């Protein structure tokens, strides 16, 4: 296919037009008085959102050169979202400011390579200073503040703070759509896996259709149980002790299943069988997790163990087990705490080594089940459109909170970026490197300027006053007051601000050093005409 090529100034100007179109659509959402953007959907109702990365991903421009510029800034938003989970609008605003200022200087004769070195030098100093003014997050109130600022909703802040307190830093918090109007929190205590009873006749509560076992023995195996004779010796030992039993196996079927159900209905003993969770190697790992949690052993041929020789000592125990048709929950497993923490550390090490995002997610789930817990935030709203928008905001808030726990917090509302202005301005350089530093300095002001602009105020006046205020003091655009941002709970996670600055500078520096852009030429003939299917002689059809 023929290519269209643009060079130097033409190329950079075309890309800047694309950058501006995307950034202008995204930056209206910044700050407490930011607006929403409506996105057309081919199917269903439009999506109304103020999430920067969601808007950026939707934008496709007709001109291929402009589209390339837009896609570069979209990547800034996506990368920031991947690393920190929030701050995508801030990253877009920073990138636009750096690109605009940079192109002005390159057009005026500055050397792009020198400018790039200046940008990199300034950003490195800015990140060091951000870390220096960062404060660790300690209390539940601080967590609630971070989540409330990100989502723009205090109730969401409290909900996420409670979820994180209940499940801990190793826990998993998932966000689901609720059937009702209210947004609520559901926390699963203990280890839960998505396998239910193999027969409904095993339930102990026929109203709720669930089986509740108090202080049961737990047989864990990766084998199929077809013949009751295989587990009869260990069953007899459990019956003698008068305690219920949970069997976790690859499957329980045929004569074994029938015998267990019959004895359960007769009241001889209380037993529930469930299928083992997961598949393949993941199943083996999850069974081992259950064994460690309950203080039992996995009866498997890999270890030379057989069901018919199993004893009560090899079974796990727990305070309580609840089994429904879909899930099994083990509460307060009786495993040794040192073995559990060793297993947790082993999973953490695997998480650090793996390069697969899917594997990391599954390892995180296993870690949560062993060390923390699982919390589900059920999002409710009056309409589907509001539900989607609310869900996106809560996801942002959750990501922000995790980032804050990881690297601490700085003053919000763009204040932190202006607080480090003087330290970056003190860098010594000359020529084009100095120009690069000045480009970063100008961009550090831009988030505050945009937040003020969205609130209907003059951004430059706010920025100038902010430069002379004490560290941490900033402008609250929600009510127009000058306050200590951290004391007022207007905070941003350090990781979010850092990622936004790093990713924006990376793409800006690359775009400034671009000298040629190559794109496909549009097909002037348009799509090929559909051939006549020879249906002309069928005029008599009704």
UniProtKB/Swiss-Prot annotation:
Keyword check for ATP-binding: yes
Principal cellular location given in the protein's record: cytoplasm
Class of this enzyme: isomerase
EC number: 5.6.1.7
Keywords: ATP-binding, Chaperone, Cytoplasm, Isomerase, Nucleotide-binding
Record's catalysed reaction(s): ATP + H2O + a folded polypeptide = ADP + phosphate + an unfolded polypeptide
Region feature Disordered, mapped onto this chain: 522-542
Biological processes, Gene Ontology terms: protein refolding
NCBIfam families per record: GroEL, PRK00013.1, PRK12849.1, PRK12850.1, PRK12851.1
Family in the record: Belongs to the chaperonin (HSP60) family.
Oligomer status and interactors: Forms a cylinder of 14 subunits composed of two heptameric rings stacked back-to-back. Interacts with the co-chaperonin GroES.
Protein name according to UniProt: Chaperonin GroEL
């Amino acid at each position: 296919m023929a290519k269209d090529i643009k060079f130097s100034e033409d190329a950079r100007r075309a890309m800047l037009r694309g950058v501006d179109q995307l950034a202008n659509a995204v930056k209206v959402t910044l700050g407490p008085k930011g607006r929403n953007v409506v996105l057309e959907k081919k199917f269903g109702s439009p999506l109304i959102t103020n999430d920067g990365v969601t808007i950026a991903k939707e934008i496709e421009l007709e001109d291929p050169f402009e589209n390339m510029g837009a896609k570069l800034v979209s990547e800034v938003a996506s990368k920031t979202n991947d690393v920190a989970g929030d701050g995508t609008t801030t990253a877009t605003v920073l990138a636009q400011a750096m690109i605009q200022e940079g192109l002005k200087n390159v057009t005026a004769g500055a050397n792009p390579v020198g400018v790039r070195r200046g940008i990199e030098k300034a950003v490195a100093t800015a990140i060091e200073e951000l870390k220096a003014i960062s404060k660790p997050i300690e209390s539940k109130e601080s967590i609630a503040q971070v989540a409330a600022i990100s989502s723009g909703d205090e109730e969401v802040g409290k909900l996420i703070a409670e979820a994180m307190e209940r499940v801990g830093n190793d826990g998993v918090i998932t966000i689901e759509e609720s059937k009702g109007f209210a947004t609520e929190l559901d926390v699963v205590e203990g280890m839960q896996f998505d396998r239910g009873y193999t027969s409904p006749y095993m339930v102990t509560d026929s109203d709720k259709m669930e089986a509740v076992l108090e202080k049961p023995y737990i047989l864990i195996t990766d084998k199929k149980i077809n013949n009751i004779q295989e587990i009869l010796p260990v069953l007899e030992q459990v019956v003698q002790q008068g305690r219920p039993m949970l069997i976790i196996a690859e499957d329980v079927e045929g004569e074994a299943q029938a015998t267990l159900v019959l004895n359960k209905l007769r009241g001889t003993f209380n037993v529930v069988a469930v299928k083992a969770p997961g598949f393949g190697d993941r199943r083996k790992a999850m069974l081992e997790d259950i064994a460690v949690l309950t203080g039992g052993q996995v009866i498997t041929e890999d270890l030379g163990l057989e069901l018919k020789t199993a004893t009560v000592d090899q079974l796990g125990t727990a305070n309580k087990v609840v089994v429904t048709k879909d899930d099994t929950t083990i509460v307060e497993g009786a495993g040794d705490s040192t073995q559990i923490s060793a297993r947790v550390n082993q999973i953490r090490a695997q998480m650090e080594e793996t390069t697969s995002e899917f594997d990391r997610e599954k390892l995180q789930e296993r870690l949560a089940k062993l060390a923390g817990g699982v919390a589900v935030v059920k999002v409710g709203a009056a309409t589907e459109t509001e539900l989607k928008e609310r869900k996106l905001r809560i996801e942002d808030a959750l990501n922000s909170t995790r980032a804050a726990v990881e690297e601490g917090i700085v003053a919000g509302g763009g204040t932190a970026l202006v607080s480090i202005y003087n330290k970056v301005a003190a860098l010594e350089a000359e020529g084009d490197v100095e120009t690069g530093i000045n480009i970063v300095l100008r961009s550090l002001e831009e988030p505050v300027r945009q937040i003020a602009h969205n609130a209907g105020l003059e951004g430059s006046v706010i920025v100038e006053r902010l430069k002379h205020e004490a560290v941490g003091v900033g402008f609250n655009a929600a009510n127009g007051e000058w306050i200590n941002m951290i004391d007022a709970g207007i905070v941003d996670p350090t990781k979010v601000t850092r990622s936004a600055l790093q990713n924006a500078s990376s793409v800006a520096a690359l775009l400034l050093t671009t000298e040629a852009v190559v794109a496909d030429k549009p097909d002037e003939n348009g799509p090929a005409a559909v051939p006549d299917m020879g249906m002309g002689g069928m005029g008599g059809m009704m």
